Each structure stands twice: as C-alpha cells, then as structure tokens.
Amino acid sequence: MKKVLSMLLAVVMVLALAAPCFAAEADRTLRVEAIYTSEWFNPLVYGSTDKAVMHALFDTLTKFDNDGNVIPGLAKSWEKDGDKVTFHLNEAYFTDGNRVKASDVVFSFNTILQDSQLKYNMTMWAAGCEAVDDETVVFTLANTYCRYENFLAELLYVVEEEGYDPDTDWASQPPVGSGPYIFEGQDNARTVKLTANPNYWNGEPAIKNVEVVACIDDATALIALQTGELDVASQIGKAAYAQTATMDGVTGVSFNGWQNSGLFDFVDDVNFRQAVFHAINRDTLVAICLDGNGAPCQDLFAAKVSGKYAGAVSFTGYDLDLAKEEIAKSEADLSRVYTIEVYDADSAAAAQCIQADLAVIGIQTEIVEEEIGTWYDNLMAGNMDFSIVAMGTDMVGTEDMLSIYDPDAGYPLPVSDELVQMVKNAPTIADDDERYAEVVKTIELAVEEAAWVPLFDAPMYYAYNSSLKGTVDVTAATCVMYVGDMSFAD
C-alpha cells in the first residue's frame, strides 16, 4: 500500500512540476515576421498592410490549403453557372457579435471599387456583386476563365458594414472583422499585437497572443528562429533556405508556386531567338542556380499557372544541334556583344549559366547588373537585348499571361502582328472550348517566335519554428498564412 501511495505521490509531483511548462506553452506568444510594415489596418482602402495581420483580423470567402488549392473559408460552398458564381456563407459572426451577412460582402466589394488604386483588385475578375439573402451572395465574373477563387482568397477581406465610418484613422485601428484575432495595438517598433478572438465562429485559436514584427534580414531572421525570438520568417532567400537544413528546431519550406523564370529576348531575328531558346540547358540552371530545387519549364508558363493548358503544347527545350542550325540561319550580327541585364544576385547567377551556353553557339554576351529602377525602365522600353524575369502569381492564368506579348498591355517584344492579334482576341472568346483551341494556337505561335524563353519554375521559401503546427507550405509563394489555425506542439 505504501509503495502504491509513493508512486501516486511521485506522479502528482511530476504533474505539478510539469504544469507550469504546459501553461507557459499555452500562453506562448507567436511571433511572425511581416512582409510589409503595417501602416494601415483597413483592407478596403489603399495603404501599407501585411497579409499575416489582415488574415488574422478578417476572413475571406475562400482560403488556401497546404498545396495552394482553394478551399472554403467564410463561404461553405459555391457553384459556378456561366459568368455567375453563387456563394453560400457559413454561420459566422463579427467580433462585435453581429452575424456576417451577404450584404457585408457586397459592402466590402463596393467599398474597394471606390478606391482608385485598389479597385483593380476587383475589376480584374468581377463585374458586379449582389446579395440574394443574408446567407447568399452572387458575383458576376468579368470573364469565365478568371481565377476568382484565388482573388477571393487573397484580396476581398470582409468588413462589417454597420458602424463603418470612412473618416476613421485607419492607421491606428481596423474596422470590425470576423477573423480569429482582435487588434490590440502597434508599438513604436511597428510590432502589431493581436489577441485571440474567444468567440471566433470557427473555434477559438489555440495561440492566444500573436505579434507581427517588422521585416528583418535573412541572417537575423534565422538567428531569431533558432533562439526562439521568432517563430515564422515569412519569406527568405535561397541561401537562407539551404542553411535551415543544418539548423535544429527550424523547418525550411521550398514551394514551387505560380512563378517561373524566363528570358526576354528583344533581338529582332526569329532564328536568333530560336537558337537562344534551344541553346540554354535548363537542367544545369536548376542544378546550379536553384541547388536542385525547382524544375525545368515544360510549358510556356509555370505549371500552376498553365492549369488545363499544361502539356497542350509540347516543345523542345535544350537541343544544341537545333540551336546551331537556327543560329546558322540567323542574320543577326554575331560580331557584337549582346547584353544580359539583371538586377539581383540570383538573376546574375542564372545569367552566368546562360552566358556560357550561348557562347557555345557563338553568341557573345556581357552581364550588366542595374539598379532595379533602371532595369525596369529599360525592360519596359525594350532597351536591352536579354533580361531574366520571374513571371506569374496565383491570381493569373494562361490567358492573362499571354498579355506579355501585347505591347499595349505587356512588353515591347519583337513579335509578329499576327501573334499580337491572337493574344488580344483569345480572351474575348466566350465559348470555353473555342477559347481553349485558340489559346493553344496562340501558345504554339509564341513558342515559334521565342521572344519569351521559359527556363524553370521558380521556388520560393520561408521558414518556421519546428514546434509550430498548422502552417501551410503555400505561404512561401503567397505570403498568406492563417495564424488562427496554428498551435505549438505539446
């Protein structure tokens, strides 16, 4: 009996000693690095806002899962019929206790339309929005191919209409939202402090306190992750990601998203451009410039952007014999030195690989690193020979990306009038099957003219404390995170 009692007392003592640890873990503050300094807390009016803060304070109709697929958020379901999409709302409540209604969604949409800079976030995909009843809202799409679900996950935060005062100082407080956290304030270091919404409609968050701290450099972020002063480094570079593999307690994420890197070729000679297209070894680029992460492009644009067009047009990438055949047909001046303009270290590294490949077929190049503003001006003017560019976001599809060939909407590339007209025409075709066929023809011609040379799907990176659960890999590509879904491991 004494032995049993001693064992029970020992268990009680262990639990007593352990209890403060569990309490400390439950009360632990989650610290997240911001992407942008928060100087504004109203998502309906233009200002500097951070996605981590916005998604903590406000809900969106849709969300992303780990792989970037769209899943229900404030909306529990939806169905598309032609250019109409009907959303059915969950039973959700704002932080003041009022029910979230379809009219609040319409109000949020219409308020954004009144902002001269933010309105394009809506007009790119939607022509209108109306409430059918308190739980049902219908959007009229601007076109039937737009990625409306992604726009809704990223850009339409739902704000309560009742009590909304447009004259409020949004630099010091947000409007009323329905998110998992409540705004507590911002200190002089620009750290935003949030506390859990105890009445959150989708369940009270496990982590009760969140701090979103100002941006820091990668080296400082990695040290802070390892010392426990930071839990999420929202976006890091390739070198920092590689370093996470050697760090205890830190998890690095590499995510192939909606962006691919390619080469703009402004040389007005199609055989020259075809030679360049086939001279570049994409596998070498991935191995050297991405440390084996990422993948050589199989399509004109990133796999996630290509969607149903992925694999519709097959093309030959690296083929040295074909490159030599094309350069032999070219009338371009091979005695001159062509410039590859870059603006950062990563594109400069890729340029070195391309420079070596082009030298094999007799094209001499010089790498010129410009300040980003100068580089951009030269790019938009076509005042360069080559440049390496990363293109694509989760909110665009192939029809949208083809606009790079339209000088009125994209870049002054040396392409035919026929291609420009096809690019302009394809998105206007209402019938889905007819538009698909026309887009495929447009891609085929774009590949032939080779003014855009797809290189590799470009991964993006972030890192977090390994004890953190509920993270999503897609954060690396979108900077969207859901702190309300996170918890610390016991």
Give the predicted meaning of each segment:
Residues 8, 278, 295-329, 347-349:
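Structural transition elements
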Residues 33-80, 110, 176-177:
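N-terminal lobe/hinge region of extracytoplasmic solute-binding protein
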Residues 35-52, 74, 148-157, 264, ...:
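A structural "hinge/loop" feature
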Residues 48, 65-69, 153-205, 209, ...:
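Gly/Pro-rich hinge or "lid" segments in bacterial periplasmic/extracellular proteins
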Residues 79, 84, 121-163:
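Surface-exposed binding/hinge segments that line
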Residues 102-108, 134-138, 179-180, 207-209, ...:
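Alpha-helical secondary-structure segments
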Residues 198-242, 364:
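Ligand-site clamp/hinge motif
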Residues 280-307, 346-355, 379-490:
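Detector for C-terminal structural segments
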